[in-house]
Amino acid sequence: MLEVVNRSSSDMDIFAVRSGARVRLGLAPSNVTTRFNIQRGQLPGGGTVTFQARPLLGLARAISSEPTILSPGDTVTLQIPPP
């Protein structure tokens, strides 16, 4: 599971990147904590995954997580700071 704590004033598109392939997980609205369930087989390839948050509008900057190895049952938290 990915938990996105969006403290910014911008809605963010959330992506998982693995083996060069980017998969959109969904939208993380501003000032809300959003959870995304990641199903087995949803991300291509193996190894590490990086999560990215990209603003829909505005001046917010894109945020990326550190590369992470996901195992079933893991929860990763992505913090998006206020502007």
Describe the residue ranges of each PLM region.
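Short beta-strand/loop motifs in extracellular/secreted proteins, especially
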Residues: 10-14, 47
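Exposed aromatic-hydrophobic patches
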Residues: 33-41, 78-79
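A short, solvent-exposed beta-strand micro-motif common in secreted/extracellular proteins
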Residues: 44-57
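Asparagine-centered strand-capping/turn motif at beta-strand->loop junctions
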Residues: 4-8
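Extracellular beta-sheet/turn segments enriched in Thr/Pro/Gly and aliphatic residues
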Residues: 59-83
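Short, acidic Ser/Thr/Gly-rich low-complexity loop/linker segments typical of extracellular
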Residues: 21-34
